[in-house]
Design a protein with these regions (language model features):
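Short, well-ordered beta-to-alpha junction loops that form the rim of enzyme active sites
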Residues: 29-32, 114-117, 182-184
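Conserved C-terminal helix/tail region of periplasmic/extracytoplasmic solute-binding proteins
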Residues: 225-329
């Protein structure tokens, strides 16, 4: 399964009549994230052509072209994505916002389109019950998501100072590492405190009597230098040796491999007009029109119930009148 979703064809698998995956995937009830998924599938041929054109040389130029396709939101694109997402509903379990991270642990669903921190939560929780879950990044394109704090433009004086102080506080490496330890989400902050926490979590080598790492079978190098180096002149090697399955588990969810980065794109703002159109499109996708035969049965059943209860009340009234007449005699 993990190979299917990590492949260039990773997103498209969900749109196929696949016995193992049919009706077992939950998708985010999140307009932007699911629009991104639908767009990647809709233009999968273009993404694949680009992927093959730059095979082995995924650079900034490649990412720029990738992002151009990924950020289409013209009217024609919106209509095509809507068709793709409506079609997707025939193959999935349903939409969710927050239950997916638990549903996949309890095996109510088998696949979940998830945010990285939720993926870590699910994998950690399942592992407590001796169940292994895996995290996949489809290789030709994936959405970069992030949360952010914002300061209102009209805030002034001491409130503005307080806001900046709070941002400084949560952005310090020590506090960032404590937050990551609590919620499982990766901060944009580097620093030794954060790296030490990641090292505590994932470094799998044994140590000798001098507390020095020694070569350990079943571990592979995982280079995080791209993230933790402080500047271009920093030559520090931030390499962990992790268990082999971490390539598709918590490590990959929290810190993608450097080779993943060119295939990741950031969705830009749609603009007010197109954003409203995509909101409208998303509402149409989520509406679940019932087949006419279901409507007939439901309405017929409802009318039947009304008729039954109506008849029941008439019969009851007739019996009451009859008893009254008997008492009068």
């Amino acid at each position: 399964m993990i190979e299917d979703f990590s492949s260039p064809n990773g997103w498209d698998v969900l749109w196929e009549e696949h016995e193992a995956y049919q009706s077992c995937a939950s998708i985010k009830d999140s307009m932007r994230d699911t629009y991104a998924m639908g767009l990647i599938h809709t233009f999968s041929d273009e993404f694949k052509e680009l992927y093959e054109e730059y095979q082995g040389n995924y650079n900034d130029e490649y990412n720029t072209k990738l992002s151009e396709i990924f950020n289409r939101h013209d009217n024609e694109t919106i209509d095509k994505v809507q068709e793709s997402l409506i079609e997707l509903k025939d193959y999935i379990y349903g939409f969710e916002v927050d239950t997916g991270k638990s549903d996949i642990v309890t095996q109510k669903v088998g696949i979940n389109l998830c945010w990285s921190g939720d993926a870590v939560y699910s994998m950690d929780t399942a592992e407590e019950n001796e169940v292994l879950l895996y995290f996949a990044i489809p290789s030709y394109c994936c959405n970069i998501w992030f949360d952010a704090f914002s300061i209102l433009s009209e805030v002034k004086d001491e409130r503005l100072d307080a806001a900046y102080s709070f941002l400084d506080f949560i952005s310090s490496p020590l506090i960032a590492s404590e937050n990551m330890d609590y919620v499982g989400y990766t901060p944009f902050i580097a620093g030794d405190d954060v790296f030490s926490l990641v090292e505590d979590w994932y470094e799998a080598r044994d140590v000798d009597e001098n507390d020095e790492y020694i070569e350990t079978e079943g571990t592979i190098p995982y280079d995080l230098s791209y993230f933790f180096r402080t500047n271009e002149d920093d030559e520090t090697e931030y390499v962990l040796y992790v268990e082999e399955d971490q390539i598709n588990r918590q490590m990959r969810a929290q810190y993608p491999m450097e080779e993943d980065l060119p295939h990741l794109a950031i969705m830009q703002d749609f603009g007010e007009t197109q954003n409203n159109k995509i909101v409208s499109m998303w509402e149409k996708v989520k509406v679940n029109p019932l087949p006419i035969w279901v409507v007939i049965i439901v309405v017929g059943g409802f009318v039947g119930l009304l008729s039954f209860f109506g008849s029941y009340k008439l019969i009851k009234k007739a019996k009451i009148r009859k008893r009254k007449k008997l008492r009068e005699k």
